């Protein structure tokens, strides 16, 4: 996690005045350092994540600008040239979440990216407001990741079987 810029300013640019952040905080992960199977021999694999407000303009120009910005900061912190070694690059952003997942406003974090929708405060599997409405996936309990998403589907199926006369395959 790179918290080398103003956290309050970035948070304000997500929640109070939604826009692409001037100096974004970001997360960097180079999984090939601990799992060599995720990159070709002699290469590394990594990704960056920048928290953004939903429903912002999304273009290749903006994506490239922000990639260059955070890569320059990473190079500054590591005192290493990285960009010249990149042989493949791909971006995934708001428009991709809308197109691939029909995600409301391109939001990658669920109904809202707020404290009240994280950890144990996530929406429960069974709706409190709508009878016989069940939620599954990483944005509900038990949480993010493939195993918890599959578990939430199994729990929802079991709840549907218990609460209705329908038998659901699990």
Language-model-detected regions and their locations in the chain:
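Conserved FAD/dinucleotide-binding core of flavoprotein oxidoreductases
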Residues: 40-73
